[in-house]
Amino acid sequence: MSYSCGLPSLSCRTSCSSRPCVPPSCHGCTLPGACNIPANVSNCNWFCEGSFNGSEKETMQFLNDRLASYLEKVRQLERDNAELENLIRERSQQQEPLVCASYQSYFKTIEELQQKILCSKSENARLVVQIDNAKLASDDFRTKYETELSLRQLVESDINGLRRILDELTLCRSDLEAQVESLKEELLCLKQNHEQEVNTLRCQLGDRLNVEVDAAPTVDLNQVLNETRSQYEALVETNRREVEQWFATQTEELNKQVVSSSEQLQSYQAEIIELRRTVNALEIELQAQHNLRDSLENTLTESEARYSSQLSQVQRLITNVESQLAEIRSDLERQNQEYQVLLDVRARLECEINTYRSLLESEDCKLPSNPCATTNACDKSTGPCISNPCGLRARCGPCNTFGY
């Protein structure tokens, strides 16, 4: 791009007339891509004497091109920055309410699940306590059952012993009855023998009554026999009474023992029936407690499985949300880094613009206000000066580009 400058032609001094005013190296360059631009143009000490030489025109043209490209790049970067800011703003406006709403719902769901888990834990603890109480009650019932079973066995053994005693007493009673019968038969036999002997003696005495003997008074045999008979009868009666009394006493005692044994047997049978009923009721209750424990354990297992599945689902949701948050954070960090890079580029461009501006200002200040005072300053190789160098000079294109 060529600029038509209204400035008069300028030429360098004799010390720099044979070479362009460009430093041998770009050590003064501080901006990227500007190494071909002189960092300090004032080293050439150039002033207006007539017209620019070729190298100075090329340098100014190059500076104007670079400045225009940098300004265009700054505008493009500003547009890109504005687009990125709008995109970030739209993205944040689009995602912020959704994320907040989803987080609130997740927090509410998590709180509800935590409350349910706490309720389940308390219910589980209560069920465990009930199971422990049921186990203790079942152990107590088992102990009572074993105690009652041992008592039942003892009572049955006592009943068997009493039955054996009753059998022995029955045998003894039958023996005593047999003895009484035998004594009665013996008594009848004795009576019959006595009658036979009496009759025999009477017959013998009846045959001897005709004999008369003068002797001492004889003994009355009938009286003796009667006395003997009365004595035997009294003895037999006494023995019979004693035997009957002994038999009655033994029978009464045996009856009392049988009655007491039967009463005890009935009471024991009633106790056994009651114990059987109690044992059956305890067995039924124990079976019910076992069924209740099994049902509670199944319910607990199902609840744990259900809540574990719900908790895993919530964990997956939380993981997805955290991954989305991580992606959003990474996107924000990346955009922030890009924004910082753009800000750095903008700052460097502004610094470069300020540097070019200061260079141009310094070069404008170094231009002499009356170059005709030094008429011998022109070199022969650069051509003669303009006849009227002190005329008014207008700003060139690059100066207008900076806004002066």
From Swiss-Prot:
Keywords: Coiled coil, Intermediate filament, Keratin. Residues 57-91 are annotated as: Coil 1A. It comes from the Eukaryota. Residues 92-102 are annotated as: Linker 1. SMART domains: Filament. The record marks A305 as: Stutter. It holds the Pfam family Filament. Residues 204-219 are annotated as: Linker 12. InterPro entries: IF_conserved, IF_rod_dom, Keratin_I. Residues 1-56 are annotated as: Head. Residues 220-363 are annotated as: Coil 2. GO terms for cellular component: cytoskeleton; cytosol; extracellular space; intermediate filament. Residues 56-367 form the IF rod domain. Expressed in the hair follicles. Residues 103-203 are annotated as: Coil 1B. Residues 364-404 are annotated as: Tail. Belongs to the intermediate filament family. This is Keratin, type I cuticular Ha3-I.
